[in-house]
Every structure is written in structure tokens, then in C-alpha cells.
């Protein structure tokens, strides 16, 4: 049975269909998939209209920074701190996993920051793609690596 507070909507993007879910507390997840496996909620694009518009503007190049409430209620506190730190990385720039860990208040937790980025349910609003290895290589990522490359290239113009 769907969570009565959870709403979903979808958007076609250059990297595929994205399914958004959210609550009154904010945007909860973004999943890139043809169908939203495991995301059950009331289909309500109006409830997620700000997120849909901002994502469309991001992919068209008109938006460089998101201004959305996020529902991080089910996220571990360290992961939430890492996500907030990643959101400070400007459009078109990158930071290492170690730098993001330090920004999140845990300078010795680069690997843990990497695991948090790999599990981030809110890309590209939380710009996990901007977090790379200290040697400048883009490293791995939860979604396919081509998506990370595409997002980095998109922001570099």
C-alpha cells in the first residue's frame, strides 16, 4: 500500500527518465529508471512541480544551483552532512572525497564520504557527480559511470 504522504512524479531528461518522490518535508529521492521500482506513492506532479521545473532548468543549462527542501529523515547523520557539503561545490567544479569529508566535519573519512556519495538518493540535486578522487580521476559512482561523465561534461559546457 502506498505511503499516503509520499508523492511521485517523473521527468524525461538527457540521461533517461527520472522518478522523483517526496513528502511534505521535501524531496526524498530521485531515481533514474524506466519504471520506479520500489517507489510507491501517489502520482502527483503538482506536489513536486518546483523540483520538476528546477531539474528541467538544470538539464537545459539555465539552472546552476538547486533551491529545494530535501527530506533527509531516513538518512544517516554523517551521510546527510556529506550531502550538504557536496551541495556547496559550485557548478562546473569538483572536490575530492577527502575535501568533502572535511567539509562535513570528518576530515579522515574520505572512504566513508565515497560510500555516502555512492548511495546518495538525490542526484543531481545533491551533486555527487562533482566529487572525485584526489588524483583528479572521476572514480566510481552508484549510477552508471557514463552518467557521472555526462553530468560533469554538461556543467563544463
Model-predicted regions and their roles:
Residues 134-157:
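…primarily DNA-binding HTH/wHTH and HhH modules…
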Residues 1-108, 154-157:
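Basic nucleic-acid-binding alpha-helical/helix-turn surface characteristic of O6-alkylguanine DNA
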Residues 52, 117, 121, 145:
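Short amphipathic alpha-helical/adjacent loop interface patches that line ligand
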Residues 108-123:
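Regulatory, non-catalytic segments
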Residues 124-131:
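Short Lys/Arg-enriched helix C-cap and helix-to-coil transition segments
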Residues 115, 130, 149-150:
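Extracytoplasmic/periplasmic beta-strand context in beta-sandwich domains
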Amino acid at each position: 500500500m502506498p505511503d499516503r504522504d509520499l508523492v511521485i512524479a517523473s521527468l524525461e531528461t538527457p540521461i533517461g527518465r527520472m522518478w522523483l518522490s517526496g513528502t511534505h518535508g521535501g524531496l526524498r529521492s530521485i531515481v533514474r529508471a524506466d519504471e520506479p521500482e520500489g517507489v510507491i506513492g501517489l502520482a502527483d506532479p503538482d506536489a513536486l512541480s518546483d523540483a520538476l521545473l528546477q531539474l528541467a532548468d538544470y538539464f537545459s543549462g539555465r539552472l546552476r544551483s538547486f533551491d529545494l527542501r530535501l527530506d533527509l529523515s531516513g538518512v544517516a547523520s554523517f551521510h546527510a552532512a556529506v550531502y550538504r557539503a557536496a551541495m556547496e561545490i559550485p557548478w562546473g567544479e569538483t572536490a575530492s572525497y577527502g575535501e568533502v569529508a572535511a567539509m562535513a566535519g570528518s576530515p579522515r573519512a574520505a572512504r566513508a564520504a565515497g560510500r555516502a556519495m555512492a548511495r546518495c538518493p538525490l542526484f543531481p540535486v545533491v551533486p555527487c557527480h562533482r566529487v572525485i578522487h584526489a588524483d583528479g580521476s572521476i572514480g566510481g559512482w552508484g549510477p552508471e559511470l557514463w552518467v557521472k561523465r555526462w553530468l560533469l561534461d554538461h556543467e563544463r559546457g
